[in-house]
Each structure stands twice: as structure tokens, then as C-alpha cells.
Swiss-Prot record:
Pfam families: GrpE. Keywords: Chaperone, Mitochondrion, Transit peptide. Belongs to the GrpE family. GO terms for cellular component: PAM complex, Tim23 associated import motor. Component of the PAM complex, at least composed of mtHsp70, MGE1, TIM44, PAM16, PAM17 and PAM18. Essential component of the PAM complex, a complex required for the translocation of transit peptide-containing proteins from the inner membrane into the mitochondrial matrix in an ATP-dependent manner. Seems to control the nucleotide-dependent binding of SSC1 to substrate proteins. Its main location: mitochondrion. It is found in: Mitochondrion matrix. Residues 42-75 are annotated as: Disordered. One of its GO terms (molecular function) is adenyl-nucleotide exchange factor activity. One of its GO terms (biological process) is protein refolding. It comes from Debaryomyces hansenii (strain ATCC 36239 / CBS 767 / BCRC 21394 / JCM 1990 / NBRC 0083 / IGC 2968). This is GrpE protein homolog, mitochondrial.
Length: 243
């Protein structure tokens, strides 16, 4: 009986000691496992962090690329708008230059038209006056012929003839002044060189005391209309004695 009781006590003590040894040993055995679990979790978290970072970078890269594309497109749009504005400005400058050119030509044409119209009116006026003046010149010529027909002795001895002569001379002067107001002037070429554009030679006589080619006698007075020859003077010209 005692032996059986001792053996049972020993067994129970052994079992307890084994349990205690297991309790003591278990933490030592589990420590490496926990460290491995922690390492694995750390690696997993690192891997997940890298993956998240990569995903974030991957998500950011398309956004950055999209923003870059938008900026590039915006820059292209701005450049195209600037080019379009430059083209419009150049076109407007050309149109403005053309308008200025047309305006200058229009002004020049208008001034030329004014000048030509003025000249045409003056020509028409001169032509009408020329025809009328030529008819009046015959009357003036008759006054000259009448006055030249009276001799000086008659004027000295006959007062009535003298009064008539003075009246005819005054009438002639009135005619000449009236013609002068309209640009018609008498030409007296005595002593001038013969000019075929203004004079008409009716005869030539050699005179030793006068220079050849000069006008020494006026048979009919000449007249000009606004400095143009209305009627050439009929004159006698000194002839060269050697010819």
C-alpha cells in the first residue's frame, strides 16, 4: 500500500514538473515564431507601402502627363491665337495702306479734274472772247487809220478838226482800255527784232542807220490775249544791205 501510494505521488509530481517545464519552455519556443510573424508583417507592410507608393506614383504620373498635355495644348492654342491676331493685324495694315493709297489717288484725281476743268473753262472763255475781240479790233484799226490820216498842219490850223481828232483819239483809248481789262493788249514792236511768232513781215527795206532784222515800221498793230498772240503785227523789217 505504501509503495503504491509513493509511486502515485511520484507520478503526479512528475506530471506537474513536466507541466511546469512546458510552461517555462513555451515562451522561449514561441519567441522566434513571434519575431518571424512580426518580421513577416513588417515586410508585408513595407511591401504594401511600396505598392501603395507605386500605385500613388502610377496614379500621379497620368495626372502629371494629362496636366502637361493640357499645358502644351494651352500653349499651342495661345500661339495659334497670337499668330491669328498677327495675321489679322497684317491684313488690317495692308487694307489701311490700300485705303490711304486710294485716298491719295482720289485726291490727286480730283485736283487734276479741278485743274483740267479750270483750263477747259478758261479755254472756252478765251475762245469766245477771242472771236469777239477780233471783231472789235477792226473798229480799233479804223480809229487808227482815221487818226493817222490827219496831218499835223491841219491840226494846228483847224480847231474843229483838232476837236474831232481828240474825240476820236479818246474813243480809241476807251476801246483799248476795255480790251485790256479782258486781257487783250496792243503790241507795238517798233525797234524790236523781228519775231515770226509775233510779227508778220509785209516788206523789207535796207537802211544803213538801222540794224538788219529790226522792225522800223508798223502797218497794223498786233494784239495778244492773255499773253498769247491774238493777231500778229504787220510790220516792215530792215533788210541787210549786202543781201
Amino acid at each position: 500500500m505504501q509503495r503504491a501510494l509513493l509511486s502515485s505521488l511520484r507520478r503526479s509530481a512528475g506530471i506537474r514538473s513536466g507541466v511546469n517545464s512546458m510552461r517555462v519552455v513555451r515562451p522561449t519556443v514561441l519567441a522566434p515564431r513571434m519575431s518571424m510573424i512580426r518580421f513577416a508583417s513588417t515586410e508585408a507592410s513595407k511591401k504594401e507601402g511600396k505598392e501603395d507608393k507605386a500605385e500613388a506614383q502610377g496614379s500621379q504620373e497620368p495626372e502629371t502627363a494629362a496636366e502637361t498635355n493640357k499645358e502644351a495644348e494651352g500653349a499651342k492654342v495661345e500661339v495659334s491665337e497670337i499668330d491669328e491676331l498677327k495675321a489679322k493685324l497684317t491684313k488690317k495694315d495692308r487694307e489701311l495702306a490700300d485705303m490711304k493709297n486710294h485716298y491719295a489717288r482720289a485726291i490727286a484725281d480730283f485736283r487734276n479734274l479741278q485743274e483740267s476743268t479750270k483750263l477747259e473753262k478758261q479755254k472756252a472763255r478765251d475762245f469766245a472772247l477771242q472771236k469777239f475781240a477780233k471783231d472789235l479790233l477792226e473798229s480799233v484799226d479804223n480809229f487808227d487809220l482815221a487818226l493817222n490820216a490827219v496831218k499835223e498842219d491841219t491840226l494846228k490850223n483847224n480847231s474843229e478838226v483838232k476837236n474831232l481828232y481828240d474825240g476820236v483819239d479818246m474813243t480809241r483809248n476807251v476801246f483799248e482800255k476795255t480790251l485790256a481789262r479782258h486781257g487783250i493788249e496792243k503790241v507795238d514792236p517798233i525797234g524790236e527784232q523781228f519775231d515770226p511768232n509775233q510779227h508778220e513781215a509785209t516788206f523789207e527795206i535796207a537802211q544803213p542807220d538801222k540794224e538788219p532784222g529790226t522792225v522800223f515800221h508798223v502797218q497794223q498793230n498786233g494784239y495778244t490775249l492773255n499773253s498769247r498772240v491774238l493777231r500778229p503785227a504787220k510790220v516792215g523789217v530792215v533788210k541787210d544791205a549786202e543781201n
